[in-house]
Swiss-Prot record:
Gene Ontology cellular component terms for the protein in this record: extracellular region
Modified residues (Phosphoserine): S63
Name of the molecule in the record: BPI fold-containing family B member 2
Modification Phosphothreonine occurs at: T55
Species this chain originates from: Mus musculus
Listed SUPFAM superfamilies: Bactericidal permeability-increasing protein, BPI
Signal peptide: 1-22
Family (UniProt): Belongs to the BPI/LBP/Plunc superfamily. BPI/LBP family.
Gene3D superfamilies found in the cross-reference section: Bactericidal permeability-increasing protein, domain 1 (3.15.10.10), Bactericidal permeability-increasing protein, domain 2 (3.15.20.10)
UniProt xrefs under PANTHER family: BPI FOLD-CONTAINING FAMILY B MEMBER 2, BPI FOLD-CONTAINING FAMILY B MEMBER 4-RELATED
Length: 462
């Protein structure tokens, strides 16, 4: 599998994507550009060299009175040149130059020679029935150049050298391409990791799959990728807004980036719906009587609401239960993304050794600035407050509530816990489409009208 690692990025090429929308699936558009192929070419030399360490059959030397079996061994396979390019509508063309250092254990003395070989292969990229990518090699050839003798082997006759070369070429001609086929099959296994489940939270997962045949041009390869978000094994389904598929313009983002990933509004909507249904956005804030920084107690609240002071003459902690009954709304505008929450905040008194006593509840609206970033293979978020809280009384067991006075108290005790909770949750991130051990690096996130674009480099880590 080690030899599959680097060329596994070649798959990623396959794994990135323009998406044709299906009704219940969020869509992501990813493109791998020429820079990604250059990276694969660079890190792919080592695994290709290992794959070319093949065994050569013994050479039967007819020069004597009796045929002699002479061992032939590849000492080293060096790949100084490895190049990949896109073939529009097909896949990727591979060309590589390899220099084989070969030792022939002939009598009376062994000889060492260097045999240059050019490898050419066309790799076809397709989608299989389970929604992952599959590679095949319909065309492969080996082109041999004349071998050169290393110093110390100059006494070998030209006739013997010619016979040895013919034997080596005949033996390697099919073996080299067979090992290229094997390398590609290893990559297919690696590509299968694209469709595995990735956790989003303790009870939620995301699963990616390729939804259509890849689109390949001379500049990039793109795939249509669908995402299924699930909670407790059940998919989160949200109707698509409009019938038009998500299309990522070309060109877009950093022209020198290896990968360009487009994330649709629908993906964000489904992710937030899942978090809301899971209860992950809910929180509880408890006051501490001995804390100077937490005025969440009946003594402070009683100064604003007389009935609270009447019911609780002794200082009693307060508890805020925050529940999001409505799905959060993310809005994506050029260079700006916001998150709107509309939680219900229930205020309870928490007398010692007694059940919580409901006081009143508030409908809250809060607008947050949403900052997005990519770390390794995850899209992460952080929030900050935009303006203030908008509060209104939903129900009350303590009579009239003067919101002008309560607003300052609730905002003070509510803001930091809310932001801390959201930032911890969004900071966990959602895994972007990738194969195992492949990470996005040096990523730049741009917000456009109705979608997000990630321009990124790629790094394969063992």
């Amino acid at each position: 599998m080690a030899r599959a690692c680097s060329l596994g990025l070649l798959l990623l090429l396959l794994l990135l994507l323009r998406t044709v929308v299906t009704v219940s699936l969020p869509v992501i558009v990813v493109r791998l550009n020429k820079a990604a192929l250059d990276y694969v070419s660079d890190i792919g030399k080592a695994p290709l060299q290992r794959a070319l360490q093949v065994t050569i059959s013994d050479f039967m030397d007819p020069s004597g009175e009796v045929l002699q079996s002479t061992r032939v061994q590849i000492l080293d396979a060096h790949v100084p040149f490895f190049y990949l390019k896109f073939i529009a509508g097909f896949g990727v063309h591979l060309s590589a130059a390899a220099n084989f250092t070969i030792k022939v254990f002939s009598v009376p003395e062994p000889m060492e020679l260097v045999l240059p070989v050019d490898l050419l292969a066309d790799v076809h990229v397709a989608r299989d029935s389970i929604g992952t990518l599959v590679l095949s090699v319909p065309a492969c050839s080996s082109i041999f150049s004349p071998a050169g003798m290393l110093d110390g082997s100059i006494s070998t006759s030209q006739e013997l050298l010619d016979r040895v070369q013919e034997h080596i070429k005949a033996d390697l001609n099919n073996k080299l391409c067979l090992h290229v086929y094997g390398l590609v099959q290893d990559l297919n296994v690696h590509l299968g990791t694209l469709i595995g489940l990735s956790p989003v939270g303790p009870e939620s997962q995301i699963r990616y799959s390729i939804t259509s045949m890849p689109t390949i041009t001379s500049n990039y390869i793109s795939l249509d990728i669908g995402a299924i978000l699930s909670l407790l094994g059940k998919p989160i389904l949200l109707p698509m807004h409009g019938a038009h598929p998500f299309v990522l313009p070309w060109p877009l983002g950093d022209a020198g980036a290896m990968a360009t990933v487009g994330l649709s509004q629908h993906l964000f909507d489904c992710a937030l719906l899942m978090l809301q249904k899971a209860g992950s956005l809910n929180l509880e804030i408890t006051g501490q009587l001995n804390s100077k920084n937490n005025p969440l107690n009946t003594s402070v609240l009683g100064q604003l609401i007389p009935e609270v002071a009447h019911l609780f003459p002794e200082p009693t902690p307060l508890v805020l239960k925050v529940q999001l009954g409505a799905t959060p709304v993310v809005t994506l505008h050029t260079s700006n993304s916001t998150l709107q929450l509309q939680p219900l905040v229930e205020v309870f008194a928490a007398p010692s050794n007694l059940a919580l006593q409901f006081l009143f509840s508030l409908d809250v609206m809060v607008n947050l600035d949403l900052q997005l970033s990519v770390s390794k293979a995850k899209l992460r978020g952080s929030t900050s407050l935009l303006g203030g809280f908008q509060l209104s009384v939903a129900t009350s067991n303590v009579g009239s509530v003067d919101m002008d006075q309560v607003l300052t108290l609730i905002s003070t005790v509510f803001q930091k816990p809310l932001l801390d909770h959201l930032n911890a949750l969004l900071g966990m991130g959602v895994v972007l489409p990738r194969v195992h051990n492949l990470h996005y690096v040096h990523s730049e996130v741009l917000v456009r009208e109705g979608y997000v674009v990630v321009s990124s480099g790629l790094a394969y880590q063992h």
